[in-house]
Structures are given as C-alpha cells and as structure tokens.
C-alpha cells in the first residue's frame, strides 16, 4: 500500500522531516497542501523534468509536490527508478512464433545449452539464450491516461490515515503493518521530543487500537501496560520473539525459549513485568494460565536457570490462582454461528449485528467472512439436492492459516447436513449479512456524496474480508474475464539482485497435464491455446517467464504456479497480467508493456506459490504458499482446488452483488462518461466518484467503503 519495495501498483512516497527514508518512501517536508511552483528554484525544475521523463516512460507520473532535496532526488533517481524501470521482454525467446515453429526436441537443445552456460559453469560464464537482444518497448502516449501516480504526502497525514486503519477491526499483512507502525512511531517520537503528547492520551489511544499486532508493538515502544490478560500474553511473547502473534507450535515455543536465552533484556523485562503485578492483576492474568501454561513454564524454567527466583514465585502464584479464577476459552457467537445455525428471522440477527457493532464485536469485514462461509456451504447443499454432487463425492473445505498457507479438509457429501432446517438457517445468516453490508456501504456512499462508480467490465471483484485478502490492490478470488481479450499473458519478472536467480512459472490443468520447463511448452502442438515462453535460470540483469493464452474458447482450466528453484527465502518477483485484441500480436516481441493491466511485487516465502486459477475462461486471483517443492507437480490438493472453484466459487460475495441494491444512489460509468458528466455539471467532481480501474486501484478503494 505504501512501500514501493512491496507493491509498486499503489506507490506513496514520503520524507520524514529531516530523515530521508522511512522504510523506503518519501514525502514533502512541510504540511502545505499545495507547493508554490513559482517560488521554487531552477534546480527543482531540472530535477523534476529529469525524473518526469524517466518515470513517464515506465508508466509512472511524479507528483510535483515532492521536495527534491539531494537525498530525496537520489533515492527517487536510483532506488525507485531502478524498481520500476524493467524490460518485460527479457524472455528466453524473442517472440511466440519461435516456440511454435520448433518441436520439443529442438526446444530441449536450447534448454540444455542454456543450462550448460549457467549451472554448468557455476554462473561464471556468459549466459546463452536465443533472445540475445531483448526488444525494449516504451509506453505509448496514447496510454498516458493509464499512468500510475507516485504521490507526495506529509508524515502526519499518513500517520493519521494509518491510525484510522488500525482502529478498524481488519487484519493487516505483516509488511504493510510494519510500514504503518514506522510512520506512526516516528511522528509520535517527534511529538514526544516537543512534549506534545500526553501520556494518558497515548495509553488510551493504544488501548483503543483494534488491530492486535499494532497495539502490542506500540505498547512495547511507548511502555504501555494492558488490562486484558490476552494482551499481556501477546506483549510477553512479542518481547521474546519479536512476533506479536502467539503460535504455540513446537517451532514457535522453541523461538520463544531462544529469545529468553539469547536476549538478557527480554528476560529482565518479562521478569520485571510479572514481579510487579499486584495480587488483583495476578488473579486476572491467571484466568488464561492454563491456555498459555507452556509459555509460563518456559519462562519459569529459564528464569530459574538464571537465578530469577522472584519470577518463579510470581508464576507459582498464577498457578494457584488459576484453580479459582480460570476462564475456559469460549467460541464467540459470530465465530460459531455457521455450525450453531440460526432458526429465527434474519431481522433479529441483523439487530444483534448492530448491537455488536457498537461494542466493537462485529464489523463489515466479519459480515463478509460469515456471508462467504454460509453461501459456500449453501452452494454445496444445493448442488447435492440437485444431484450435481453425489452422496459419496468428495467435498473439499479450504482453511486459511498464517503466512498465506492453506489446509484442505476432505469429507463425503453424505457427512454434510443437507436438511431443510440447515438450508433455512444458512439463508437467514446469508440474507442478514448481505443486508448489513448493503446498509453499511449505502451509508458510506451517502455520507461522502458518492454518485458514480467507474468499474471495468473485464473484472469481477470480490469483497475482501481483511487487508490480507489482496494480491497487490486486487482482492483475492476476484475473477478476470479472459474471454474479453484475444491475447492474455500471465508472467513473472525478477532480477538476481532481488534474491533469486531461477524462478519457474508453470501451469497444471484439471487432468494433471503440465505446461512448463520440464514438460510440454504448449497444450496442443497443432493449435496451442497455451504457450510457455521458456526457462530462464539467470536474471542478469533481468528475466521474464510468461504463459500466453490465446483462442480463449480453448483455454483449459489450470492452476498457475511460480517455484523458487535457485534463490533465497524472502526474495521477490513481480507478477503481471496483459490483455490485447490486436491481430499482429507478438511479432518481434513477447510482452507489450502498454498492455499490462496489472502488476504487483510478491515475496517468495516458500518454494512453491500458487498465483491463480483459470476456471471457465476466468483468471481467479490467488496468492497461496502452496508447498516447499522446487518443482510443481500434480497432487490431491490441486484436485481439491479445482473442485473448490467448481462448487464453491459462486459463494464469494462480489462487489457486483451489492450494486443491484445501490442502483438508486450510484451509477456505473466509464472514465469518458464521467468526464462528460463533469463538463455538463460543475457540481460534480472527482470526490463524487470511486474509480475501480486497475491503474488507480488501491486497497483503500475497498477498505474505505467497508471499514
């Protein structure tokens, strides 16, 4: 959202007063809304003109309000420009006809010659590729309306915006959360230095933050204590591990113990915290003693080893108090409603939603999550009732766990309750959630005087249940219609300096047939609908692998993977998607940068990541850490994902699902139509419109209407 190193699709730059960079971004040094260009020096115009010409050729426009001091200019000119200046034709072959014209043996010979020049020489010789002079294409002037803007912002305005996000009950990705916290911490530190922050205000503000991870980090920095026992445990865990999420697995507990052993300050701070708790505070904390007993035992064990007897005494007291004050962990009403059911009217459930919203226990994001669960289960039940899914057919459920991983649960349809009462209950839950979401969005549109949506016709957006449910700025499970274009390309771009030399893009269809470096390069030699661009094993200076989909009526259902064959965990690559309808496509090149409708940087956390699913001529955006395999291969989990798309995808709540209920207050228009409306009515401005086009889309576009 803010860090160019994370996502160039939605860049923001800021400069932290006298500090050039905070997590790789810049801002103007004042809080002025508009900079008086006539008072600026000649040097400013030279620097702006230089950056303008460079960035516009890459599809980016620089906000003139950015202050171009020496260090800011250097950062933009080197780090940022280097990040956006890339050649998407750094492919193995020069154009797609080079692949079609060769049989698999000829392609293999090219592969082997390439491997000999990279792995065979331990990367010490020159790399052989048939495309020894990649075509460099620039952004055409006709595409300037699709430019992405690198904006300027003051640290204060960003911090206020981020604090507003943290005060909403939405889960955030670790990277964006850290960016937000850096901004907020730096601003508050500046205010502290000027004695402008009241301690009581600070404690109240941090305690009211709804994002649990952010609350813990800020409390640690500013030495704030908590009343809630679960918050206390998160704080202790964070002090030892640096991670605010408690994971009581063998690996997680091992990291906790290592933190206590390696960091004497962590032991001292945790020990000091526990020994200074009053009797009443110990009784409150003992209510979660059994839930976190392993953690307390490890603290006691290590403190005993380091002769911290007072800490051991405090933990012994917790153990005694727990016999009286222990509170079993209970599943919340909303967390268990799908299994519990709801046999009353949807209006009664909606009333409870409103009540819990006021107390912070319910939100639009939770309503979306519950709606999706109820709707997906209802889809399965209805498919079974209609005879599409038989009694002994497999029924798959996907559960997301931390770090973008997922767990597949298999059961037979006969094990699923398909009674009329279940159908009624699921419908009641679904309708109540939808009504709540519609009312919430309607209120936002009315309050902000939004009258128009600019919505592309080639994408069907899902509504996100959290900030983690995005790929770049596109919500996960959104569907891009490939039938709108004759030519579709899914590709990955990377450089050695980003941490990996060899990424492998591939696709496996619903019959287990693979397209990729160790399989066929096409799905059909005579009339290929899918073509693989070739295997690049050295990104010096850069590399691209791509899958070209044409003749959309023949596109097979596939899952698209990217595997890290030779590289480091935490390295990155850039996922991009192009669409084009020209007749002479791909002559002398493979990728036209003017056709890129979407791109985002993705961190390679595991060896194998799933980038998307092609189902019924639609590309479904996903970002799932699939496995630790260096090479993609068919498995039962691929079968599960295809079945999930076949039977469950329609259950996801889409943005379009809400528009029928909002047509009386908002109108869907194109960019040109909206510009004409503005010309005809001087009271209509950009503030009366929400633009869902790819080039302007940010996570905030969705989050703002839902938070």
Positions of predicted regions on the chain:
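Intrinsic-disorder/low-complexity signal
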Residues: 1-252, 258, 262-264, 273-274, ...
